[in-house]
């Protein structure tokens, strides 16, 4: 299930709206709303999101969260022409292994990316990913 699917279902349930009523009010089929919630259909158009926001009277924060999940749910990406051959290989390897990765492995990769996003890691820095590293025995008094 995509992040958008999860958010759509959560919003619909929070506002107490049936799929049929939501779809009808927005001008869509109930089967389309169901397919979106199940992740069978790819992310919808911005028009769908705007109609949903108007119908549910979403707050600015709720709409921003929904748009963030819409972006996170993209299924197709284009590798930039300026990417290195290693970047192409990495994308291909990740694509081939995607269905085989556990949730824990995905979390570790996302934590790594977040670490890089925060800034360059200096030589000797050891980022901690999900656990505390023990001090070396050297330098400890006995």
Predicted regions and their residues:
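A short, Lys/Arg-rich alpha-helix, primarily the initiator
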Residues: 1-14, 107-108, 141
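DNA major-groove recognition helix of helix-turn-helix/homeodomain DNA-binding modules
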Residues: 47-65, 71
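Interfacial/linker helices and their anchor residues that mediate assembly or domain coupling
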Residues: 71-141
């Amino acid at each position: 299930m995509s992040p958008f699917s999860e958010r759509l279902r959560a919003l619909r349930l929070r506002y107490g709206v049936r799929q049929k009523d939501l779809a009808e009010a927005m001008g869509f089929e109930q089967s389309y709303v169901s397919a979106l919630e199940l992740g069978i259909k790819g992310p919808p158009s911005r028009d769908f999101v705007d109609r949903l926001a108007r119908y549910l009277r979403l707050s600015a924060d709720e709409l921003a969260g929904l748009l963030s999940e819409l972006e996170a749910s993209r299924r197709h990406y284009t590798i930039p022409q300026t990417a290195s051959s290693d970047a192409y290989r990495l994308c291909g390897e990740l694509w081939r292994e995607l269905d085989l990765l556990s949730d824990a492995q995905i979390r570790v990769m996302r934590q790594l990316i977040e670490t890089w996003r925060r800034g360059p890691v200096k030589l000797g820095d050891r980022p901690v990913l999900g656990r505390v590293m023990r001090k070396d025995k050297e330098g400890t008094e006995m």
